[in-house]
Amino acid sequence: MGIETFALPGWTGELIPELRPADLAREVARVTDPAAALKTLHWGRNYLYVIRLETVAGPVDAVVKQFRHAGGKERVRRRLRGSKAEKSWRVAHALLDAGLLTPEPLLLLESESESGPAFYVCRQETGVLEARYLLRAANVGREREEFPGVDYPRFLEELGRMARRLHDAGFWHRDLSSGNVLLRCDADGAPAALYLIDLNRTRMGRRLTTNERLRDLSRMPLLRPEDRDRFLASYWGEREGGPVRKMVYLSYHHGFLWKNRSKQRLRGGTRTLRDLFLPRTAHAHIPEAPAEASARDRIVWDRLSD
């Protein structure tokens, strides 16, 4: 897969020549404007939204992930290591070269301003299921009722095999959780493809230690012992597992679950304090009210209406 670099006023970037935007400057302006989104996926520390990218090969629905660098820590990290968008771009291409799946990377955009945002754009996969919803159902014994079209045991086995291929290829994802795996099934419910997403923490290019492998595996929220056993057996095989590795895995796994529960409790408390002392603000994709708008019309733009 070839890569083409480009520069525009205020921006530099890379793209796939076969899917080059038909009007590069226009599409860059649209990609970087959340108001052009067809759908918002996540609005938090990072922004994720769907746009329709007009390319030389026709329109392509794409997911845009915006990484901000407003704080000093983020700017220093970007200067020393590059942006998280660039990291996602490099890892995505390396995964595909290694025969692993991730939504096709389409565009990398870097603001020339040190404090400006960076954007990673990839193809939107359709007909896929975010594994987090399947695992949530399984953890309460409802996977068959909620997802009758998915062969859950075969999914766990393929998930373990995919994780093994990932690690053997020298990738340490560092956030291998159910929210970062997309599943596509065959007509009979068997897993046809597993896509990895959220790649900006990934380290690559070296052999993983057993400890690093177990730390990655432990982040998958499998609460039923039989599900964990099936997953680990598919990862290690019959000969490589063993009680010591399982014990270390369980210590990491329970530690990860405890950490997540603690974070949720802490966030609940800090959110209450934040709401008391900081005013609510509108999402960034809602523009300012036009100067000529009447008082009645301005209600539409009021931050409390969002």
Task: Describe each model-derived feature in a short phrase.
Residues 130-146:
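AlphaC helix of the protein kinase catalytic domain
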Residues 176-186:
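Hydrophobic residue at the +6 position relative to the catalytic HRD Asp in the kinase catalytic loop
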Residues 3-23, 31-34:
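Cationic, histidine-enriched alpha-helical/coil surfaces that engage anionic ligands
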Residues 55, 185-188:
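Short acidic-glycine loop/turn motifs at beta-strand connectors
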Residues 2-9, 258-297:
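Membrane-proximal basic amphipathic "stem/tether" segments
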Residues 192-272:
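C-lobe/activation-segment region of protein kinase-like
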Residues 23-132, 164-169, 173, 268, ...:
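Conserved ATP-binding subdomain of kinase catalytic cores across diverse folds
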